[in-house]
């Protein structure tokens, strides 16, 4: 076998040299090279085991090939967009530094999120105003920190002086059978209630589909109200099982919640899901609470699942939540503010923490007056009597007044038609006036 291979090699080399000397074409050389390279000499009748195994025909999966190409293109586009964003952020950072050197109102430190907001602003004046707002907020924050430090120092000084004065007069500590309740034990009790509510409690849904209808400032305000709502629910005696429905991962809502909770977002006893409330619960049990609804909520139903729209609309987008509920064919209701309150000024939209406090009070007591006491006093002029009780009072009082007035009229008529009954209705008999006239003095008569 080795001998044959060496022989072929020598023949090929000699043929190449002769062709080169005679000036043959390169195509012939290439063809001869391919032919000699692909030749296989079998000196035995037996076939090798490796070649005997028939290899399966490998078919090319076009879908997989397309997906790989698309993923490569998508990754390239993502890299391009990331580089573009980084370059634009660097440009905005340089612009802020230039304005700071020029002596304009610019914050000393600015985050990437604030730079992104600055990039989204369309005009130069809007960017100037936003930077001025950030600088003012930074100054206020530093002033607050300094005041807190001063208060702490003054408190520590006062406490040290008090300790020195009262060190001699301190009485001996007495034993007591009452145990001290620590803040940690209260916190664990509240968390245990939330765990029980997640298993057995009534659900309460916060609809998180209004991210596109709000500005960044309104979204931050909404997240603050959601955190307050979760706190009030945790501290209540019978908490709700709170659902954050349609909360997309890595959305502005999600990022702001993770940022505000400072690492404690995973430990909050709230069910956060990207599914809609229609997918989570049956439609028959859902009631969407909105101020634009024509239906009034007369009593709290413990079998229903109430939905609150997570929306802070400074520009008063009326009918947004009602349109969303109608699109999904859901029942709607509004709080009976006109029936129980003398509404004075302002819209009837309440904040999220006020809504959950009203619902918690209704769930515990069922008293509308207690529940609506959480409505701000600046919006109404006190409580009014319910319409049903007013009608009842009008019926009762009106009937009594009507009976009294008819009795009075009958007495008057009887006196009028009774002969000699009253001097006011029947004229008295005429008497002789001569004696009276004689006693009167005349103006022309002289006095004796």
UniProtKB/Swiss-Prot annotation:
Protein name: tRNA methyltransferase 10 homolog C
Function: Mitochondrial tRNA N(1)-methyltransferase involved in mitochondrial tRNA maturation. Component of mitochondrial ribonuclease P, which cleaves tRNA molecules in their 5'-ends. Together with hsd17b10/mrpp2, forms a subcomplex of the mitochondrial ribonuclease P, named MRPP1-MRPP2 subcomplex, which displays functions that are independent of the ribonuclease P activity. The MRPP1-MRPP2 subcomplex catalyzes the formation of N(1)-methylguanine and N(1)-methyladenine at position 9 (m1G9 and m1A9, respectively) in tRNAs; trmt10c/mrpp1 acting as the catalytic N(1)-methyltransferase subunit.
Stretches the record annotates as Disordered: 144-167, 429-448
Source species: Xenopus tropicalis (Western clawed frog)
Pfam families the record matches: tRNA_m1G_MT
Subunit structure and binding partners: Component of mitochondrial ribonuclease P. Interacts with HSD17B10/MRPP2.
Keywords from the named record: Coiled coil, Methyltransferase, Mitochondrion, Mitochondrion nucleoid, S-adenosyl-L-methionine, Transferase, Transit peptide, tRNA processing
EC number annotated for this UniProt entry: 2.1.1.-, 2.1.1.218, 2.1.1.221
GO molecular-function terms, A-Z: tRNA (adenine(9)-N1)-methyltransferase activity; tRNA (guanosine(9)-N1)-methyltransferase activity; tRNA binding
Record flagged with keyword tRNA processing: yes
Subcellular location: Mitochondrion matrix, Mitochondrion nucleoid
GO-annotated biological processes: methylation; mitochondrial tRNA 5'-end processing; mitochondrial tRNA processing; mRNA processing
Family affiliation: Belongs to the class IV-like SAM-binding methyltransferase superfamily. TRM10 family.
Main EC class the enzyme belongs to: transferase
GO cellular component: a single term: mitochondrial nucleoid
Annotated ranges, domain SAM-dependent MTase TRM10-type: 190-382
Signal peptide: none
Coiled coil stretches, renumbered: 137-165
InterPro entries hit by this protein: MT_TRM10-typ, MT_TRM10-typ_sf, Trm10_C_MTase_dom, tRNA_m1G_MeTrfase_euk, tRNA_MeTrfase_TRMD/TRM10
Organism superkingdom: Eukaryota
Chemical reaction(s) catalysed: adenosine(9) in tRNA + S-adenosyl-L-methionine = N(1)-methyladenosine(9) in tRNA + S-adenosyl-L-homocysteine + H(+); guanosine(9) in tRNA + S-adenosyl-L-methionine = N(1)-methylguanosine(9) in tRNA + S-adenosyl-L-homocysteine + H(+); an adenosine in mRNA + S-adenosyl-L-methionine = an N(1)-methyladenosine in mRNA + S-adenosyl-L-homocysteine + H(+)
Presequence positions on this chain: 1-48
CDD domains the UniProt entry points to: Trm10_MRRP1
């Amino acid at each position: 076998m080795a001998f044959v291979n060496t022989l072929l090699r020598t023949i090929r080399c000699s043929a190449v040299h002769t062709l080169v000397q005679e000036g043959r074409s390169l195509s012939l050389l290439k063809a001869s090279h391919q032919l000699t390279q692909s030749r296989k000499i079998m000196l035995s009748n037996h076939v090798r085991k490796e070649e005997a195994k028939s290899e399966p025909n490998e078919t090319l999966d076009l879908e997989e090939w397309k997906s790989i190409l698309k993923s490569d293109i998508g990754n390239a586009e993502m890299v391009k967009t990331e580089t573009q964003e980084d370059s634009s952020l660097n440009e905005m950072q340089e612009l802020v530094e230039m304005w700071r050197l020029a002596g304009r109102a610019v914050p000393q430190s600015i985050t990437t999120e604030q730079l992104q907001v600055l990039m989204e602003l369309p005009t130069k004046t809007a960017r100037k105003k936003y930077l001025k707002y950030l600088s003012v907020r930074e100054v206020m924050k530093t002033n607050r920190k300094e005041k807190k430090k001063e208060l702490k120092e003054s408190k520590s000084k006062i406490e040290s002086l008090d300790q020195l004065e009262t060190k001699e007069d301190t009485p001996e500590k007495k034993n007591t059978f009452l145990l001290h309740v620590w803040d940690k034990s209260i916190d664990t009790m509240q968390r245990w209630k939330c765990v029980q509510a997640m298993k057995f409690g009534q659900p309460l849904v916060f609809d998180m589909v209004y991210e596109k209808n709000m500005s960044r400032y309104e979204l931050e305000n909404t997240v603050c109200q959601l955190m307050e709502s979760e706190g009030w629910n945790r501290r209540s005696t019978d908490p709700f099982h709170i659902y954050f429905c349609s909360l997309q991962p890595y959305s502005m809502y999600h990022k702001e919640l993770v940022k505000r909770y400072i690492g404690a977002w995973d430990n909050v006893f709230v069910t956060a899901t990207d599914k809609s409330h229609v997918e989570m619960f049956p439609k028959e049990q859902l009631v969407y609470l909105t101020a634009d609804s024509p239906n009034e909520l007369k009593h709290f139903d413990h079998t229903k699942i109430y939905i609150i729209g997570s929306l802070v609309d400074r520009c008063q987008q009326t009918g947004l939540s009602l349109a969303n509920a109608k699109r999904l064919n859901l029942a709607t209701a509004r709080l009976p503010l006109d029936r129980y309150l003398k509404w004075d000024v302002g819209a009837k939209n309440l904040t999220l923490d006020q809504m959950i406090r009203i619902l918690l009070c209704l769930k515990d007591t069922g008293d509308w007056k207690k529940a609506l006491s959480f409505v701000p006093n600046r919006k109404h002029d006190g409580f009014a009597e319910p319409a049903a009780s007013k009608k009842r009072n009008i019926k009762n009082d009106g009937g009594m007044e009507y009976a009294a007035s008819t009795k009075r009229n009958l007495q008057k008529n009887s006196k009028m038609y009774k002969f000699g009954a009253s001097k006011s209705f029947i004229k008295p008999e005429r008497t002789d006036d001569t004696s009276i006239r004689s006693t009167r003095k005349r103006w022309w008569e002289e006095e004796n």
